[in-house]
Curated annotation (Swiss-Prot):
Lineage: Bacteria, Pseudomonadati, Pseudomonadota, Betaproteobacteria, Rhodocyclales
A cellular component term, taken from the record's GO annotations: cytoplasm
Function: Required for maturation of urease via the functional incorporation of the urease nickel metallocenter.
Family indicated by similarity: Belongs to the UreF family.
Statement: the UniProt record of this protein carries the keyword Cell wall biogenesis/degradation: no
Entry-linked InterPro entries: UreF (IPR002639), UreF_sf (IPR038277)
GO molecular function, one term: nickel cation binding
Sorted UniProt keywords: Chaperone, Cytoplasm, Nickel insertion
Stated name of the protein: Urease accessory protein UreF
This protein's record includes keyword Transit peptide: no
Record text on subunit structure and interactions: UreD, UreF and UreG form a complex that acts as a GTP-hydrolysis-dependent molecular chaperone, activating the urease apoprotein by helping to assemble the nickel containing metallocenter of UreC. The UreE protein probably delivers the nickel.
Annotated compartments: Cytoplasm
Amino acid sequence: MKTCLQLARLLQLASPTLPVGAYTYSQGLEWAVESGVIRDEASAGRWIADLMHHGIGCYEAPMVAALMTAWSAGDVDEIECLNAEFLASRESAELRAETVQMGFSMRRLLRDLRDDTLAAVATLVETQAEVAFPTVWSGIAAAWQIEPEAAVTAYLWSWAENQVMAALKAVPLGQASGQRLLAELGSRIPEAAANANTLPKSRWSNFTPAFAIACARHETQYSRLFRS
């Protein structure tokens, strides 16, 4: 990290106080609890770690890295292509609605921040009918000149933290369990972030059938705390 200001900006982007409603989504974890796949700290850790390794780390994280490169280069065509690709990649209606809603909230935040360095990002995303959350998030990170590997690290941490918070509520688990899970997941993030920044697009993959099934079945789950 080049400056303390960039670090502060990165912490702001990774903060659970970011007003995008991430805490209302479990991304299928709630159904995994309902079905008995997740039942305790150990099984929650396996579920989240497997998803980070086989899904988020192999597709969404590389997508963020590629989007940052496109934003930094001012490559509008590539940004729009990656945005459309990410929207099309969502495995269920709830997941697609999630990223669109969070993207909309980030677009609104862009206006509210009144930061001149974000003007180009705001102008482009306003032209899109639907914008995915990673598209806007990576645009802000690039505009704030945050290094890609640091940005992807923070993105993965924010995702993992949200998953752990969902597990704490849904299983439920205690605060100490949550901290142990975060410590274990945190130890895996540097490798995942480094891999995401170098993974060629031909090797991107979000082939996670159990995750897709969990997200789809959550849509008809009788009793729910979360929106996905």
